[in-house]
Amino acid sequence: GVALGFRRLSIIDLSPAGHQPMASSGGRFIIAFNGEVYNHLELRAELLAAGAVPVWRGHSDTETLLAGFEHWGVEATLAKTVGMFAIALWDVRDRTLHLVRDRFGEKPLYYGWVGRGAGQAFVFGSELKALRALEGFANPVCREALAQYMRFMVVPAPRSIYQGIYKLEPGCLLSIKGASPQAAPAQPLRPSAVYESLTLSRWWSLADVVQA
């Protein structure tokens, strides 16, 4: 099963229509979204021109994202989106969980595995303290990350200070189709990696933009 929880700092649409987790009008997607989409009004206008406007429940950028995902698909919508965000998106139809981080990583997103032995739980959150609060969290400090911190005074992505917990890198999309892997990989995953039912890819790359 999949569980999404959200504690919202309301910026756009303070009404109950902006509450999260939020389901798309067609029921395919459920989202927990931290951040802001600066061009969401332009995206709404584009959806209107395409005849793909649902019955809007409010005026939140979250609802705009969901409408885009239903009409254009996940990666095509992300390519149109200007903003800062960390997204957890559950595709009900395809039984796929997507985790997304904005182009420059303005909003953090952590993921990893909690528990011991077989049957570890895959978890994710905007902050490490959210993961530390989970029942069964006993992940030790990662020695490699500690060494990096002592050298650079920061833990570079994709590692976090905890073993088995990683930072989703900027511009990346992590997808899990079906059951999640039940144990952390031996080494941090890099973009283009496939690990059992998990795939990690870049939906945006500065190098690609410069080359274009």
Named regions from a protein language model:
Residues 1-212:
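Cysteine-centered catalytic environments shared across enzyme families
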